[in-house]
Amino acid sequence: MSKKGAGSRAKGDKAETLAALQAANEELRAKLTDIQIELQQEKSKVSKVEREKSQELKQVREHEQRKHAVLVTELKTKLHEEKMKELQAVREALLRQHEAELLRVIKIKDNENQRLQALLNTLRDGAPDKVKTVLLCEAKEEAKKGFEVEKVKMQQEISELKGAKKQVEEALTMVIQADKIKAAEIRSVYHLHQEEITRIKKECEREIRRLMEEIRFKDRAVFVLERELGVQAGHAQRLQLQKEALDEQLSQAKEAERHPGSPRRELPYASGAGDASDHSGSPEQQLDEKDARRFQLKIAELSAIIRKLEDRNALLSEERNELLKRLREAESQYKPLLDKNKRLTRKNEDLSHTLRRIESKLKFVTQENIEMRQRAGIIRRPSSLNDLDQSQDEREIDFLKLQIVEQQNLIDELSKTLETAGYVKSVLERDKLLRYRKQRKKMAKLPKPVVVETFFGYDEEASLESDGSSISYQTDRTDQTPCTPEDDLEEGMAKEETELRFRQLTMEYQALQRAYALLQEQVGGTLDAEREVKTREQLQAEIQRAQTRVEDLEKALAEQGQDMKWIEEKQALYRRNQELVEKIKQMETEEARLKHEVQDAKDQNELLEFRILELEERERKSPAINFHHTPFVDGKSPLQVYCEAEGVTDILVTELMKKLDILGDNANLTNEEQVVVIQARTVLTLAEKWLQRIEETESALQRKMVDLESEKELFSKQKGYLDEELDYRKQALDQAHKHILELEAMLYDALQQEAGAKVAELLSEEEREKLKVAVEQWKRQVMSELRERDAQILRERMELLQIAQQRIKELEERIETQKRQIKELEEKFLFLFLFFSLAFILWS
């Protein structure tokens, strides 16, 4: 009766604690729902602004999502049915195997009982020494056989693992050598290309400087010749005036001769003067005509030289364009080599990861081998019925421990997923900080002296305001431009590095999950080394205590001369009772722990259901983001696509660029016009690059939205997994209940059958009372520990929930910042487009 009263009291305490825990859990749930409702209200205020932009894309996306959802649900149902069938088959096979094992163990126990009964009879007949020697020999032989078999198995496994390791190492060395050879080839090709590019640039610069000096020298010569020609033209004009004056005098003299009234004495003077003028004017006129002819010949020669120089300048411009084309082709050939190098580095990293996994697996197998050897050394043959029962109980305890460890590992995996997500976030933040520091360092650097190419050569002392006179190709790549291709390449490399790191982390996490699943399949459960060491130490301490007690009893019997058989039976019954009490305690603790885990799984399941409902409502209320961008067709420039999207179909960007190139090489234009044309071409190329960058940012934002949707799907998958885990833990709890009932029945039968009068003699009333008090104290202690553990788990769950909410807030803030950036980019692009359209209108 006292036992039943204690059991009812313990059940009442358990019910009270469970009720208290459920009430606390419901309060926490209510608080959590209030907090989440407030959060939803705040989010709804923010989502009102976002709803106006994304109504057009929502219908198409919902239609596609419905199709995909139908397909996914069908696939999920098929997979679930297949998994359930496989699980049912595995369960049936395990049940059959378990029943066969039980039958085999029962047969072994019966045989051992018969053999031990025969040995007891022989001992009673008076041949203890012979039996002991026979038992020792049999035990040694069996131990040797078992050890040899285990040794052979372990040696075979070690040899197989060594062979596999050698093969993997050889393959890895081959791959590493191939990677090194390919990397060396790529480096050599890269260096050759770089040297050729630098050489071509230097030659172009020298040729351009030489041509500019020649043009400047010829321009000066033309200026000097023009000045001389002007002087000579003035002299010829003076001579022409003198000639006209002499002609007038001659005409006057002739008129005077015709009129008779004129004096005669003036005639000789006039005629003499006319003759003198004729004689003096004819050689000067001849000299002027010779000089004019000579100057005309010089002018013709100079014009021919200028034409030759113009032709040579055109040829050099064509050569320059060809060299630029070759340089672009070399860059396009260099890009696939870089991509190939990246792929090879990725393969190398994957192989290193596989090698690490294989090494860790080898270490685990060697550790397991050592543990199996230690177990084989510890295992000994049971010498009596009590030892055999004890070994069976230990097996059952180990099986239950393995189940407990499996469930604990499931919880650890869920926590590891959260930790990996936090780690990925920290890596991304660190990459952002590094990029920001690089940009600050670049901005902090002093601007380099700009080399400006003028009409008369290169001017290194020109101010920054003389950008209008720069026509060289190199000035487009100075630090005065807002964003250079080197900066674009560095930013692209940084983005690729972050994406590579994220992919590597996800691959490592998936590989760890696969390795963990394989280990569970091979071992049949996880092994905790610390627990095994503790249990081993406890068993060794119990064995030592039992041995000392047996020695003390033997000494007491030798001294007192009492009956050995009665004392052995009494001791065996006492041990049996104590073991059964310990088993009941352990099973009660396991039952409480399993109940607590089931409750935790239910809470987590409810939280995930609430989260899924919240995400569905949010998706229903606030549709997805619509960026309203036109996709770029391959082969078309982004500026052309944008012009077509805006309705401007008259302008062809490629033809416009060709015309600008032709106008830039045209010698009929002035220097300022050539500079304006080249600057317009560079601005157009920069606008195309800017458009490409905007397209890349928009695609990255769309990828992030897809990632958020995949996280939502992951939440739903985790809910399904937790449902399955909850069912599994319920089944384990039911099995534990059944096992506890079986143990209680075994204890009751043992007390009924074996105890009798001897138990009454063994345990007095005081000892029974002490035992009841100890059991009640132990139950109170277990209940207090359970309460503390429940409170700790609740605290941990609340912390995890807060972390998840913080992550959701951070993601929403990131989305808002990205939306702002997109708006700013769109505004900047519209401003640029208007600016260029006005510039083209004014220029035309």
Curated annotation (Swiss-Prot):
Report if keyword Phosphoprotein is assigned: yes
Comp. bias (Low complexity): 270-282
Q: List the GO terms this entry assigns under cellular component, sorted alphabetically.
A: Golgi apparatus
What are the entry keywords? Answer: Coiled coil, Golgi apparatus, Phosphoprotein
**Molecular function via GO:** kinase binding; microtubule binding
**Broad class of the protein's primary localization:** Golgi
Coiled coil ranges (UniProt) are 8-259, 289-421, 493-621, 688-833
Biased segments, Basic and acidic residues type: 254-267
Start-end of Polar residues biased regions:
466-483
Q: Which InterPro entries match?
A: JAKMIP, JAKMIP_C
Concerning Pfam families, the annotation shows: JAKMIP_CC3
The subcellular location is: Golgi apparatus
Which superkingdom heads the taxonomic lineage of this protein's source? Eukaryota
Q: Is Coiled coil one of the keywords?
A: yes
Spell out which residues are annotated as carrying Phosphoserine.
Answer: 384
| Disordered, as annotated region | 249-290, 466-488
Bilayer-crossing regions:
none
Concerning its family, UniProt says: Belongs to the JAKMIP family.
Protein name, as recorded: Janus kinase and microtubule-interacting protein 3
Species of provenance: Mus musculus
